[in-house]
Amino acid sequence: KTMYDFRPIVVLDDARTREIIEFIKNENLTYLDDNLCYTEEYRGYSIAVMRHVDLGHLCGYIDLAEENINEKQYNLLDRLAHGGITHYINNEIGFDCGHCYDIMPYSCFNNLFCSGKYRDFNYVLNNLKEMVDALVESKGGQLQCG
């Protein structure tokens, strides 16, 4: 799937569903590239917002490069990340917005979680920046690699 062929599995015929679908189309066109990804450098870290191809929710990632974080820092980031850390592989740490209380736009299960909330691009980007800020502050305000 690309940003141009948004096809939810189930389309409920109601105003809220139509509004969310239109919002996501605009969000993809405004922020995300052809791979449904947005990246930027923030305070010395590469951060990324990506759309899950199958379920449609957004995920956020921080590239720690060669940096190691300790248990205290991991726990801090886990508390700040939406729904907790769900990804930590090869010095990349991240979270997703596909929990039971979130709207997963391409999912056929949305009708079961109709009281959920769609976590938009700005929500994910701000959550990533909050995590990076906390990580930098946990090191005395200076980046320390290695």
Go through each PLM region and give its residues:
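N-terminal low-complexity, intrinsically disordered segments
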Residues: 2-69
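Polybasic, proline/glycine-rich intrinsically disordered low-complexity segments
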Residues: 28-31, 38, 45, 69-146
